[in-house]
Swiss-Prot record:
Signal peptide: 1-16
Tissues expressing this chain: Expressed by the venom gland.
Name of protein: Basic phospholipase A2 homolog Pgo-K49
Location in or out of the cell: Secreted
UniProt entry keywords in alphabetical sequence: Disulfide bond, Myotoxin, Secreted, Signal, Toxin
Organism: Cerrophidion godmani
Site (Cationic membrane-docking site (MDoS)): K128, K133
Record GO biological process: arachidonate secretion; lipid catabolic process; negative regulation of T cell proliferation; phospholipid metabolic process
Main location: secreted
Length: 137
């Protein structure tokens, strides 16, 4: 099952510790990261940038901006640790950059949960050419 989740999240093309981010999104939203957010709107998934279509898409936009602020770590390859305590994500890493990356991922997972009511199936597989120039971070 773990291998399937890793492959699914890799297909989405999310950055960062893909396994942890996929788990966080599943824990917070109950949705599979790959199938629900892999091509959502203009900002969810790798290489996708544009003016957010809704609050759900804005979560992904803010997540990309959060990653741009990271220093001294590689959001595509570095891994961090976190735990799930009392239905709460707890980032726990001694490396400051990995801690920041975990906090970015935690924030997007919570944002996606808080905006489940804005999730629009018509944006689930949204073509990139429909996206307008993105706002600045």
């Amino acid at each position: 099952m773990r291998t399937l989740l890793i492959v699914a999240v890799l297909l989405v093309g999310v950055e960062g510790s893909v396994y942890e981010l996929g788990k966080m999104i599943l824990q917070e939203t109950g949705k599979n990261a790959a199938t629900s957010y892999g091509f959502y709107g203009c900002n969810c998934g790798v290489g996708r940038r544009g003016k957010p279509k809704d609050a759900t898409d804005r979560c992904c936009f803010v997540h990309k901006c959060c990653y741009k602020k990271l220093t001294d770590c590689n959001s595509k390859t570095d891994r961090y640790s976190y735990s799930w305590k009392d239905k709460t994500i707890v980032c726990g890493d001694n490396n400051p950059c990995l801690q920041e990356m975990c906090e970015c991922d935690k924030a997007v997972a919570i944002c996606l949960r808080e905006n489940l009511n804005t999730y629009n199936k018509k944006y689930k597989i949204h073509m990139k050419f429909f996206c307008k120039k993105p706002d600045a971070c």
